[in-house]
Structures are given as C-alpha cells and as structure tokens.
From Swiss-Prot:
Coiled coil: none annotated. It is found in: Cell membrane. Keywords: Cell membrane, Glycoprotein, GPI-anchor, Lipoprotein, Membrane, Signal. Glycans are attached at residue 46. The gene is LYPD2. CDD domains: TFP_LU_ECD_LYPD2 (cd23620). This is Ly6/PLAUR domain-containing protein 2. Residues 25-100 form the UPAR/Ly6 domain. It comes from Homo sapiens.
Length: 125
C-alpha cells in the first residue's frame, strides 16, 4: 500500500514537471504604453517571475492618458509595498503564464504545490 502511494506521489511530481514548461511573460524593455506592450517572451529556466515596473503614474491621474510600463522575465523580483503611496516606480511581480498582462499585484500560488500535498497527506509522513 505504501509503495502505491509513493508511486502516486512520483507520478504527480513527474506530471507537474511535464505541465510546467518555461514561463512566458509580456516584455517591453523600454517604457511603453500598457496596451502597447504585447510582445511575449519565453523566460529562461532561472527566470521564474514576470516583473512589471510602472512609469508616468502622474500623467494617468485623473485618467488623462495611458501609463507606461516596462515588463520582463526576472530571476528575482521585489514587489513594491502595497501601501507605498507616491512611489516613483512601483514594481509588481507574478509567477504564472502571461500574468503580467497588466500590473499583476501579487504572487500567485503554484497549482502543482496543491497536487503534491494530496498524496503526502495520505502518506502521513
């Protein structure tokens, strides 16, 4: 019985690896209008985050114009403090496929993590 559970765990982990190809993010290395940043790039294996930096925030309020952003794949990303009112260049980070279509506000959970927990719970390790 325990061997069956371990085999199931190995199968789930293998499936997660197969289902998780390289991350893809929207990229625009130069400040670009949000609606104009439509180039998609496949990230390298060590780039596990999509990063968005917001520029020209002051011209957006009161909704007179489009904000500009830079977007990229990133190996590290430190998001701005949510309460950081008045920050000059707010940064947002996310880690799912094409998640930086806008300014993604936070990290999303990994679906494979939940799949991995199910067999572990039944193993009672």
């Amino acid at each position: 019985m325990r061997g069956t559970r371990l085999a199931l765990l190995a199968l789930v982990l293998a499936a997660c690896g197969e289902l998780a190809p390289a991350l893809r993010c929207y990229v625009c290395p130069e400040p670009t209008g949000v609606s104009d940043c439509v180039t998609i790039a496949t990230c390298t294996t060590n780039e596990t985050m999509c990063k968005t930096t917001l520029y020209s925030r002051e011209i957006v309020y009161p909704f007179q114009g489009d904000s500009t952003v830079t977007k990229s794949c990133a190996s590290k990303c430190k998001p701005s403090d949510v309460d950081g009112i008045g920050q000059t260049l707010p940064v947002s980070c996310c880690n799912t496929e094409l998640c930086n279509v806008d300014g993604a506000p936070a990290l999303n959970s990994l679906h494979c993590g939940a799949l991995t927990l199910l067999p572990l719970l039944s193993l009672r390790l």
